[in-house]
Amino acid sequence: MRSAVVLALLLCAGQVIALPVNSPMDTGDTEVMKCIVEVISDTLSKPSPVPVSQECFETLRGDERILSILRHQNLLKELQDLALQGAKERAPQQKHSRLEDELAEVLEKQNHQAELKEVTEEALSEDAAEARGDSKEVEENGEDADGARPQAALEPEQESRVEDAQAPGEEKEAINTHSPTRLPSQKHPDPQAEGDSDSPSQGLVDREKGLGAERGQQAKREEEEDEAGEKADAEEEGPTAAFNPHPSLSYKIRKGESWSEALVVDGARKTGAEEAQPPEGQGEREHSRQEEEEEEETAGASRGLFRGGKSRELEQEKEQERLSKEWEDAKRWSKMDQLAKELTAEKRLEGEDEEEDDPDRSMKLSFRARAYGFRGPGLQLRRGWRPSSREDSIEAGLPPPVRGYPEEKKEEEGSANRRPEDQELESLSAIEAELEKVAHQLQALRRG
């Protein structure tokens, strides 16, 4: 019994020891918690608020922890207010800076565009000035060239006029000096006076002959230089240029026109000089009349040089068009003849093996090749370019055809009995047959 009572006492003592003892700090915390609960319940029950007791207000105001929390919240609010104020102050500043940046960009763009416009205007003005200068130079060069040609043509005329004008004066002086000797005996004139009167006219004739010889030599030199340049150009251009025996015919025609005019003027002056030779029994009237005729002829020739410029240009354009057409036709015929040559060469290669067995066939083929005229369009072109007569060659400004082509002579001798139309038809038919054979061979090769 005693042991049971002791155990019960020990258990009660242990429970008493285990129970917490309320300290004054714990009591203050419990009061603060109760007050906080009342405040929370007051805030949550706003439609029907529960009033907070005055004791709770006093306990919360006296608690340091609550004061520190409230101070911290106030600091946060103040910081938020400061941040909002700074943002509000920065907004107009940012707007102002943006406007300034936009204005600066617009001004820079305008300045750049103005600079570009100035540069382009300067470049255009420089280009226009250069173009004007080039056009002026071209016009000056053309005027110089145009002025040099009539000057070159008129210089010998002026010289001849001066000489012709000097000659009558000398003749008049000679007549005046020798007039008393002729008056008593006009039927038997003095031989010395005749020699003196003939000497100026002979000097004029000699000068005219010398000038004509110099001009002929210059023309020959120019023609030789032109022929040498044409040969060099033909060698550079290759075999196709060989089909054109006169590649610079238009240039020769232009040159020939001026040369023919110069020849006409020279002939007029020569005839005038020959007529200016006074026979023994003529007087001053014939000299004056001849001088007037010479002046009229030279003036008409110089006018014709200037008036005929437009007609010459038109004729030159027509000649160029005709020459271009003939050149195109020659190219076409040259292609056809080249094909014919290739075909004949292939036939010859194929028929080399058969020639030993059948010599008559080789003879026939050679005769047909000669008859069909597979020699290229050189002779045809030469026929087309050859002037029809001596007058045409003189009008075109070309020298008269002195040397003939030996190939043309042989062809004319060999084909004297044949008509040209029959030969052309035969050659065309042969070319067509050969082309058909080549086409069949190509088709067979493609199929094979």
UniProtKB/Swiss-Prot annotation:
Keyword Secreted on entry: yes
Region (Disordered): 116-251, 263-429
Tissues showing expression: Highly expressed in adrenal medulla and pituitary gland. Weaker expression detected in cerebrum, cerebellum, spinal cord, liver, thyroid gland, striated muscle, lung, spleen, kidney, parotid gland, and sublingual gland.
Biased composition (Acidic residues): 223-238
Primary site of residence: cytoplasm
Compositional bias annotation for Basic and acidic residues: 129-139, 158-175, 205-222, 310-350, 405-422
InterPro entries, A to Z: Chromogranin_AB, Chromogranin_CS, Granin
Gene Ontology terms: biological process: defense response to bacterium; defense response to Gram-negative bacterium; defense response to Gram-positive bacterium; endocrine process; mast cell activation; mast cell chemotaxis; mast cell degranulation; negative regulation of catecholamine secretion
Methionine sulfoxide carried by residues: 363
Glycosylation sites recorded in the entry for this protein: 415
PTM text: O-glycosylated; contains chondroitin sulfate (CS). CS attachment is pH-dependent, being observed at mildly acidic conditions of pH 5 but not at neutral pH, and promotes self-assembly in vitro.
Disulfide bond residue pairs: 35-56
Keywords: Amidation, Calcium, Cleavage on pair of basic residues, Cytoplasmic vesicle, Disulfide bond, Glycoprotein, Oxidation, Phosphoprotein, Proteoglycan, Secreted, Signal
GO CC aspect terms: chromaffin granule; extracellular space; neuronal dense core vesicle; secretory granule; transport vesicle
PANTHER family in alphabetical order: CHROMOGRANIN, CHROMOGRANIN-A
Quaternary structure, from the entry: Self-interacts; self-assembly is promoted in vitro by chondroitin sulfate attachment which occurs at mildly acidic pH conditions. Interacts with SCG3. Interacts with ITPR1 in the secretory granules.
Listed name of the protein: Chromogranin-A
Organism: Equus caballus
Taxonomic placement: Eukaryota, Metazoa, Chordata, Craniata, Vertebrata
Encoding gene (name): CHGA
